[in-house]
């Protein structure tokens, strides 16, 4: 439509200028709201790739750990105190994949939180609680493996279902109490009120943690990590000594087959090796994140956002690693997966199927 002087209000140059300004101006999480957070400046192609990578991790964490839990709980051969501890660990990792990773995925890719302030706090509680629970489970599993390898014949009387239940209960209760109290009491933000106020925007969900609690978090990671490394160092020394003793005995006596004690010791060493790899994967996944948290807290939050997101997702991906480790090292787990996927566990008496090679 022409103006009074016969000219058009929108020329080609003005349209191009408007489009250029629109392209250069930052996109907001909520365009029509004041103090809206700014969206991440990723291209559509980059967003698609990130969603695929992060989404794959979440699906793998849920499906893989669900297979671990189903295998252990369904097949009677796997009903042991140690395996119940492993199933509980899988439950913690499953919950990370179910309640934490999908929402963190959207926040990481979009730079926005679309799930409300209430779930923002709850999401942070789930994040801290379930990841802490994984750490404590792995710590107790290392203690279990040490007992099993050091004295495999007495082990069944020392690590009973009651002991396993106490370990599981402690791991869950302590983690949940710690995670929820840290977030809902506001203890983590004490002394950071001005910073929190300055950074608060609509569509954001970042929990501020002061130096004291960052240091406490690091210690809560470091102490169990040192315990696990110490215990597994002892385990491998014992395993090496046992292997040397068995080799000497095999040279001295022409045995047609291994003794029962040797077979048990061999099986426990293999289990310790597999779970030791799971522990190493956990430590390697989470150590960079905790080190960065310490650096950030004491040097003024200098870590670029994309670096923080990379470290966080390396840590999250650990929740998907354990099922892959079990599938690689445990033939019984591969057989259990096949039975579950093909639906054979729905048949009568499927729980009594022999999963171990003769």
Swiss-Prot record:
GO molecular function: trace-amine receptor activity
Alphabetized UniProt keyword annotations: Cell membrane, Disulfide bond, G-protein coupled receptor, Glycoprotein, Membrane, Receptor, Transducer, Transmembrane, Transmembrane helix
SUPFAM superfamilies per the UniProt record, alphabetical: Family A G protein-coupled receptor-like
Chief localization: membrane
Disulfide partners: 37-201, 120-205
One GO term of the biological process aspect: G protein-coupled receptor signaling pathway
Transmembrane domains' residue ranges: 48-68, 84-104, 124-143, 167-187, 213-233, 275-295, 310-333
Cell compartments where the protein resides: Cell membrane
Glycosylation sites: 34, 210
Extracellular topological domain residue ranges: 1-47, 105-123, 188-212, 296-309
Membrane-related topology note: Multi-pass membrane protein
Cytoplasmic side: 69-83, 144-166, 234-274, 334-358
SMART domains, per the entry: 7TM_GPCR_Srsx
Pfam families: 7tm_1
Cellular component, GO annotation: plasma membrane
Family: Belongs to the G-protein coupled receptor 1 family.
This protein's domain notes: In addition to the well known disulfide bond common to G-protein coupled receptor 1 family, trace amine-associated receptors (TAARs) contain an unique disulfide bond (Cys-37-Cys-201) connecting the N-terminus to the extracellular Loop 2 (ECL2), which is required for agonist-induced receptor activation.
Protein name (record): Trace amine-associated receptor 7g
Gene designation per UniProt: Taar7g
């Amino acid at each position: 439509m022409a103006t009074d002087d016969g000219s058009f209000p929108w020329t080609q140059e003005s349209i191009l200028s408007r489009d250029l300004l629109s392209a250069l101006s930052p996109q907001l999480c909520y365009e029509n709201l004041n103090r809206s957070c700014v969206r991440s400046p990723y291209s559509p192609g980059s967003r698609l790739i990130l969603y695929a990578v992060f989404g794959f991790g979440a699906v793998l964490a849920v499906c893989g750990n669900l297979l671990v839990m189903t295998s252990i709980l369904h097949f009677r051969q796997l009903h042991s105190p140690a395996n119940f501890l492993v199933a509980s660990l899988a439950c913690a990792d499953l919950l990370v994949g179910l309640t934490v990773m999908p929402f963190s995925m959207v926040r990481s890719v979009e730079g926005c939180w679309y799930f409300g302030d209430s779930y923002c706090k709850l999401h942070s509680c789930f994040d801290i609680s379930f990841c802490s629970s994984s750490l404590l489970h792995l710590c107790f599993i290392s203690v279990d493996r040490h007992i099993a390898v050091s004295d495999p014949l007495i082990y069944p009387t020392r690590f009973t279902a009651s002991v396993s239940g106490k370990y599981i209960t402690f791991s869950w209760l302590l983690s949940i109490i710690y995670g929820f109290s840290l977030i809902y009491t506001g203890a983590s933000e004490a002394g950071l009120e001005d910073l929190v106020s300055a950074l608060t925007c609509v569509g954001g969900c970042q929990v501020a943690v002061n130096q004291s609690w960052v240091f406490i978090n690091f210690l809560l990671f470091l102490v169990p990590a040192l315990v696990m490394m110490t215990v597994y160092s002892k385990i491998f020394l014992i395993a090496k000594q046992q292997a040397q003793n068995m080799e000497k005995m095999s040279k001295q006596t022409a045995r047609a087959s291994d003794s029962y004690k040797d077979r048990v010791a061999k099986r426990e060493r293999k289990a310790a090796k597999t779970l030791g790899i799971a522990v190493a994967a956990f430590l390697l996944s989470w150590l960079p994140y905790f080190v960065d948290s310490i650096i950030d807290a004491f040097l003024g939050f200098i870590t670029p956002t994309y670096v923080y997101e990379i470290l966080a997702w390396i840590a999250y991906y650990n929740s998907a690693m354990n099922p892959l480790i079990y599938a690689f090292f445990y033939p019984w787990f591969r057989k259990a997966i096949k039975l579950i996927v093909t639906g054979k566990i729905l048949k009568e008496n499927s729980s009594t199927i022999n999963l171990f090679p003769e």
